[in-house]
Amino acid sequence: MVTMMREFYAIDQYPFNEDLTRSNFHQFVQNQDLGSAFVMYNEGNEVIGYVILTYIFSFEFGGRIAFLDELFLNEKARGKGYGKLAVDFVKDFAKEQGLKVVMLEIERHNKNALLLYLNKGFKEHYRNLMIYSPQN
């Protein structure tokens, strides 16, 4: 999983600390309240990607919601319908788990992802995404 995460972060030149990522992932999978991680396989049982959902509680949306934190497909798997299958899986999983909404963010340049999510029923939410890091 960490190898795929490194590949995913490299797409947009995000910093990647392998030791920290391993530690965070271990912490994440040990606590089901934080979210869920899924590995994706092709028909030949080869690993082709992963999905990370994180959970929070929202008064605005009336309960527990998911944030689709990461959806990654390796380069060989892109353009073959696996992204559509992954989004369908996330939507079905959210319904089964009683999640109120699934939110996500997309890099501005990633038009393919935007079209995928719009075609799968996601809607643009006209708010600004803001970040504050208390460690800095």
Predicted regions and their residues:
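Conserved GNAT acetyl-CoA-binding A-motif
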Residues: V87, A94-E105
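Active-site acidic-Proline motif in GNAT/NAT acetyltransferases
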Residues: N74-K76, K80, R108-H109
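Generic leucine side-chain signal with a strong bias for well-ordered alpha-helical environments
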Residues: F8, L68-L73, L99, L104, ...
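Hydrophobic alpha-helical segments typical of transmembrane helices
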Residues: N24-F25, F67, A86, V90, ...
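Acetyl-CoA-dependent GNAT
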Residues: T3-G63, D69, F93, E124-H125, ...
